[in-house]
């Protein structure tokens, strides 16, 4: 028999409101997937969108979706995200956040999420990286 996993996302009373994400995500014991940091690299390993934060977000989202699908999951199974952006400019951080919210990965960002401006990422020209944790759906 297939069990239905319930992921509970909440914003407790007494804590500030959020622009769409939740302060806490509770997952029953089960299988989890911890994705490596998703970078704006194409299948050949080449950087996509040097100096183009939107192109990099699009590639990162596509990569994250492909990796999630490879383990039978999708954006609705994501329980935590951390977005790293090479910028100290809040408008750039907001642009990246909005671009992810406008992507097919958008449901992943209704969960516990963190958005950070950083000094540097691993590849020359890399502006965006995404860490994802997902609670995998039960299997028959």
Regions found by a protein language model. Name each.
Residues 1-62, 66-79, 85-140:
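N-terminal presequence-like segments and the immediate start of the first folded domain
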């Amino acid at each position: 028999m297939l069990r239905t996993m319930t992921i509970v996302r909440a914003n407790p009373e007494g804590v500030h409101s959020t622009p769409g994400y939740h302060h806490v995500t509770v997952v029953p014991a089960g299988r989890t997937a911890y994705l490596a940091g998703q970078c704006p690299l194409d299948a050949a390993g080449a950087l996509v969108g040097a100096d183009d934060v939107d192109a990099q977000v699009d590639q990162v989202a596509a990569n994250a979706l492909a990796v999630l699908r490879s383990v039978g999951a999708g954006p609705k199974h994501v329980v935590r995200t951390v977005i790293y952006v090479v910028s100290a400019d809040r408008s750039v951080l907001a642009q990246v956040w909005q671009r992810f919210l406008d992507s097919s990965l958008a449901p992943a960002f209704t969960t516990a999420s963190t958005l950070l401006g950083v000094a540097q990422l691993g590849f020359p020209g890399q502006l965006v990286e995404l860490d994802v944790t997902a609670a995998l759906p039960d299997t028959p």
